[in-house]
Amino acid sequence: MSPMLQIAAEEMENPLIPPIPELVIGLIAFVIVFGFLAKKLLPNINKVLEERREAIEGGIEKAEAAQTEAQSVLEQYKAQLAEARHEAARLRQEAQEQGATLIAEMRAEGQRQREEIIAAGHAQIQADRKAAASALRQDVGKLATELAGKLVGESLEDHARQSRVIDRFLDELDDKATTAEATR
């Protein structure tokens, strides 16, 4: 072949289509590499992908379980908080009732003590009045006896006579005091 023909023949070959022997060798090499990868590498890849899928699904399940548990804990917390508020309100109400009862008891005790003090004061005043009246009666009786003895001119040493004169004199004084008060 002439060099020109050779160049023309080379030009006729399509550079995109490889020669058949290269195509066969490439195809055999591809099948060998693909077979090797399918036997050795593909199971490992599938295993890793399956583990990742299970881990992701397990993570999702764990997240859902954690969310459910968190929701449950939140509801328990809210229930406990509501119960604590109710208990606090009950204790506050109890304290107010006890305070009102204590105030009422203290007022009643104060009223009772006041009444006792007033009664004791009245009794003391009455006793003092009787003692003063008795002392006054004796003093007035002595003075009246002395005056009556001077006026009558006789001695009123006799106790019975002295008592009659004193009683009569005091009765006259009481009558005069009563009529003086009535005229006012």
Swiss-Prot record:
Signal sequence, renumbered to the chain: none
Subcellular location: Cell membrane
Record InterPro entries: ATP_synth_B-like_membr_sf, ATP_synth_b/b'su_bac/chlpt, ATP_synth_F0_bsu_bac, ATP_synthase_B_chain
Annotated Gene Ontology cellular component terms: plasma membrane; proton-transporting ATP synthase complex
Annotated TM spans: 16-36
UniProt keyword terms in alphabetical order: ATP synthesis, Cell membrane, CF(0), Hydrogen ion transport, Ion transport, Membrane, Transmembrane, Transmembrane helix, Transport
One Gene Ontology term of the molecular function aspect: proton-transporting ATP synthase activity, rotational mechanism
Membrane topology according to the record: Single-pass membrane protein
Record SUPFAM superfamilies: F1F0 ATP synthase subunit B, membrane domain
Keyword Ion transport attributed: yes
PANTHER family (alphabetical): ATP SYNTHASE SUBUNIT B (PTHR33445:SF1), ATP SYNTHASE SUBUNIT B', CHLOROPLASTIC (PTHR33445)
Protein purpose: F(1)F(0) ATP synthase produces ATP from ADP in the presence of a proton or sodium gradient. F-type ATPases consist of two structural domains, F(1) containing the extramembraneous catalytic core and F(0) containing the membrane proton channel, linked together by a central stalk and a peripheral stalk. During catalysis, ATP synthesis in the catalytic domain of F(1) is coupled via a rotary mechanism of the central stalk subunits to proton translocation.
Recorded family membership: Belongs to the ATPase B chain family.
Record NCBIfam families: ATP_synt_b, PRK05759.1-3
Complex and partners: F-type ATPases have 2 components, F(1) - the catalytic core - and F(0) - the membrane proton channel. F(1) has five subunits: alpha(3), beta(3), gamma(1), delta(1), epsilon(1). F(0) has three main subunits: a(1), b(2) and c(10-14). The alpha and beta chains form an alternating ring which encloses part of the gamma chain. F(1) is attached to F(0) by a central stalk formed by the gamma and epsilon chains, while a peripheral stalk is formed by the delta and b chains.
The protein's name: ATP synthase subunit b
